[in-house]
Amino acid sequence: MASSAEAAETREAFRESVRAFVEREVLPQAEDLDRHGVFPERLFKRLGQLGYFGLRYPEAVGGQGADFTTACVFYDELAAGSLSLAAIAAMQSLMGTHFVFRFGTDEQRERYLRPALRGEKVATFALTEPGAGSDLGAMRTRARRTPNGWRITGEKTWITNAPVADFLTVGARTSDEPGLASIALFLVDASTPGYTVGRPIEKLGTRSSLTSEIHLDCEVPADALLGGEGEGVKNVGGLLSEIRVMTAALALGLSRRALNDSARYASERQAFGKPIGEHQQITAKLAEMATDYHHARVATYDAAERIDRLAQRSDSGENVTAVASMVKLFATEACARIVDEATRIYGSYGFAMEYPVQRYFRDARFLLSGGGTSELLRNLVGGTVLKRGGV
């Protein structure tokens, strides 16, 4: 096992390679992708070819065998180029493929997981319903046994990648028992008769990360059940800490881009005979932005390392869930503050479509709800503090 210093050095070299890719191939396209709201097919395939989708998966299934902290470096750097592309990559490399890896058959891994990691198939994950977002207990999608497997009926909404997905993991009830105990996960091929993509959702930000409703009235084979009946919420819950820290890493990349652009603009823009960055009000804004970013960065990578220690069984995991929630809450709200201040530093141009700062402002709103809303996370963290009698 590499020493901490060696691991850090390897990670920084990886960061530089991702950053170079982003500067060379992502940034030149970011504005057009946002403006036209199209799926970035060429860049998606490039991410697969470069092995980025398989970072967290073992080499035995076509992955790279990297740790979670390294994956967060990837999400962080990619989001600095395009949060839309980073959101697509997060779905592909984490939620969309995780359950096929953990619970799929060898045949399913060959048919779905390996091509997805290579960027040849698009994956997604479908839990949210029109009447059930964070409240999974209100889920209505139903899976009923048939002689050949399962019949799934229902609808989902806010499904990332759905318009272009080749397969998806779907949450559905296997009985009429209310609450969380009857929810299970199923693998659905997008070519299955009775599976249809519904209304596209026109979004404020992350516009090239295509999102839509889906409708299910389809039959899937018996082995489409991923994990046991009634174990869906438990299995999703096991991934939530990674999802939340990953979302915080996305916020870091967007925050850094907005902060660096603002510092550059403040050095170049003149007002009253000197760069606006030399005026105290602008200096104060940059100081607050940098402080927010620094705190978010330290907390995010600390949480990522905790998850890695838990995976190595060198951490009890007692605080990982709460810490992941706190980090997601702080980093995404810090990002929202940073991009808001960035638009103010740009003055009237912060309201103009010709500068990318307006895209940062719009994209940041996605981070506030993905992985759990700020309101939900405050309830979770506050409840944990009360339960423990403090911190």
Task: Mark where each language-model region is.
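Short glycine/proline-enriched turns and hinge-like loops at secondary-structure junctions
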Residues: A66-D67, D135-G137, N161-D166, G179-S182, ...
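A short core secondary-structure module
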Residues: T153-V197
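A short, charged helix-loop
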Residues: S212-G238
